[in-house]
Curated annotation (Swiss-Prot):
Stated family: Belongs to the ALG10 glucosyltransferase family.
Protein name, UniProt field: Dol-P-Glc:Glc(2)Man(9)GlcNAc(2)-PP-Dol alpha-1,2-glucosyltransferase
InterPro entries (alphabetical): Alg10
Organism field: Kluyveromyces lactis (strain ATCC 8585 / CBS 2359 / DSM 70799 / NBRC 1267 / NRRL Y-1140 / WM37)
Glycosylated residue positions: N80, N135, N295
Its EC number(s): 2.4.1.256
Origin superkingdom: Eukaryota
Record function comment: Dol-P-Glc:Glc(2)Man(9)GlcNAc(2)-PP-Dol alpha-1,2-glucosyltransferase that operates in the biosynthetic pathway of dolichol-linked oligosaccharides, the glycan precursors employed in protein asparagine (N)-glycosylation. The assembly of dolichol-linked oligosaccharides begins on the cytosolic side of the endoplasmic reticulum membrane and finishes in its lumen. The sequential addition of sugars to dolichol pyrophosphate produces dolichol-linked oligosaccharides containing fourteen sugars, including two GlcNAcs, nine mannoses and three glucoses.
Regions that span the bilayer: 54-74, 139-159, 162-182, 184-204, 205-225, 234-251, 274-294, 312-332, 351-371, 392-412, 440-460, 465-485, 498-518
Pfam families: DIE2_ALG10 (PF04922)
Gene: ALG10
Pathway(s) served: Protein modification; protein glycosylation
């Protein structure tokens, strides 16, 4: 983390008799030497703690990855052979469109599909790449697209370079096990490769593996490709562009503690370096605008059931899911007490915030017909049994939960943001040497991008929360505090990393048990249906 740069201005001491002073140093000199040695010892101990944490993290990833991969591959095998050897829910549309491409019908489009053809083009490539080496069914081969992406490309190609720059922040193997992604490794859905391409765009922008210019253009290209899987990824292109500009502006324009000035410096740097930093992403925005004008909607196909609106409660749903999945990251005595102290010290402010949330619940809640009609999704039961159980429950129970979730979302990020000196410039002079952290500018951009991607959607769909969680999680440094107790002042995030990985696998296990245990029959479907996210 970039912190305030402190310059040591203390003097050791001056002696009237040089000879005597060498033999008999003053008390001030002794104290100064002692303090210096103590500081050096602290630095050495801290470095050892960091080194130990990094080494343990590397070993943990190397050990856990093959175990998790074998488990996911086994589950994929059982589902494709006995558990689910037929198309499931939206797969009927995705597989149908891919089959049209495989038959050479490139201009035929399934009217029920709402996303661009990125997945179907990738499925076409996957099929032709594997048809000579396997006699598996077409459905199995197409599902293999997401399994390969989830257990190989996602942790090793996308997350590994980011991990090398933020080894204390996250483990790639943990994010590989993230439940909202892992559940779709076995199905033919758009979410896995949508996430892979847009986070790879972030990876290229931060790590710069091909040099600055080439990496930024490749980042923009990956961002554009990601929009072929999900249109709302254009919003995350904005965040990545802001990060690209910001990481250079903070060095060349000398960011300080005056936030408004930093915004002005960012704008000025954007204008001065438009061609090299902004143009690659501006091309994406121009192409997306052309698509909107041509299609007259952000949605392809079934526009009537996917009309954009102002579903602000969706933002609280997203924060609630983020808080739930990140329990091992934030749960501690300090977070709990600070939230309670905030309430006790300023109850009026707390009640006004709750009132604001209740008003949003009242006037900006959208209940889509699909939510109430499709009992094959966990959200159906969450809304029926919890969120929309009754008016009393909706306002008196869910509003405080939303409030606490928002508090967790903000407070966990706060210690991980960069801090600048009010006067002194940043010592780092190359963007690639900067830590993977947000500033107050990119932090605000992250919140706004999350809001813009989830609020317009009328559907209560947890898959839409994958990228808000991933982008939030990648920029967080794991808290060193124990789960319950006083801070010990050491770098000790390993237990939390292990707990986070275990937490994800427990959730995956529960969702798999629900999937296998409960069979649902629909009159319109000839096959047995199951429950997924």
């Amino acid at each position: 983390m970039i912190s305030s740069q402190i310059q040591d201005g203390e003097t050791v001491g001056k002696y009237s008799c040089p000879t005597a002073s060498k033999r008999y140093p003053s008390d001030a000199a002794i104290m100064s030497v002692s303090e210096t040695e103590e500081k050096n010892a602290v630095v050495v101990e801290f470095s050892r703690d960091v080194e130990r944490e990094v080494v343990v993290g590397i070993y943990a990833n190397v050990i856990i990855w093959p175990i998790a991969t074998a488990l996911f591959c086994y589950l994929a095998y059982t589902l494709n052979t006995t558990g689910l050897p037929y198309v499931f829910i939206d797969e009927k549309f995705h597989v149908d469109q891919t089959l049209r491409y495989l038959r050479g019908k490139w201009y035929s489009w399934n009217g029920k599909i709402t996303t661009p053809p990125g997945l179907y083009l990738l499925g076409w490539l996957q099929y032709h790449a594997t048809r000579f080496i396997t006699n598996w069914s077409t459905l199995t081969v197409l599902r293999l697209t997401n399994l390969i992406g989830g257990v190989i490309v996602w942790p090793w190609v996308v997350l590994r370079p980011l991990y090398l720059f933020n080894a204390l922040g996250f483990w790639p193997v943990t994010l590989m096990c993230f439940p909202l992604m892992a559940s779709y490794y076995f199905l033919y859905y758009t979410d896995i490769w949508s996430t892979i391409f847009i986070v790879e765009s972030l990876n290229l922008a931060l790590v710069l593996p091909f040099g600055e210019t080439a990496s930024i253009w490749m980042s923009a290209l990956c961002g554009l490709i990601s929009c072929l899987f999900r249109q709302t990824n254009i919003v995350w292109n904005v965040l990545i562009m802001i990060l690209v500009v910001e990481r250079r502006a903070m060095i060349e324009k000398n960011f300080n503690t005056l936030n408004f000035n930093n915004y002005l410096k960012l704008v000025l740097h954007t204008l001065e370096n438009f061609k090299s930093l902004v143009l690659p992403y501006a091309i994406n925005f121009g192409l997306f605008l052309a698509f909107l004008l041509y299609n007259r909607s952000i949605t392809l196909g079934d526009k009537s059931n996917h009309v954009a609106g102002l579903h602000i409660v969706q933002f609280f749903y997203c924060l609630m899911f983020i808080a739930f999945f990140s329990v091992p990251v934030w749960f501690s005595k300090q977070v709990t007490l600070s939230y309670l102290i905030r309430f006790v010290m300023n109850p009026v402010k707390y009640l006004l915030e709750l009132l604001g949330i209740m008003l949003i619940i009242r006037y900006f809640t959208v209940v889509h017909p699909f939510l109430l009609a499709d009992n094959r999704h966990i959200t159906f039961y969450l809304f029926k049994k919890l969120i929309g159980r009754s008016s009393l429950f909706k306002y008196c129970v869910m509003a405080p939960i939303y409030h606490f979730s928002a508090y967790v979302y903000l407070e966990v990020m706060r210690p991980s943001t960069m801090i600048f000196h009010p006067i002194l410039p940043i010592e780092i002079k190359n963007p690639i040497d900067l830590p993977i952290q947000l500033t107050h500018i990119s932090w605000t951009a992250l919140i706004m991008c999350t809001f813009m991607t989830v609020v317009p959607s009328p559907l209560f769909e947890p898959r839409y929360y994958i990228l808000p969680f991933i982008f939030w999680r990648l920029f967080i440094t794991m808290a060193p505090e124990p789960f319950w107790g006083n801070p010990i002042g050491k770098v000790t995030g390993t237990k939390r990393h292990l707990s986070e990985c275990a937490w994800f696998m427990i959730i995956n296990l529960i969702t798999y048990i629900i999937f296998k245990r409960f069979d649902i029959k629909w009159e319109s479907e000839t096959t047995v249906q199951h429950i997924i996210w």
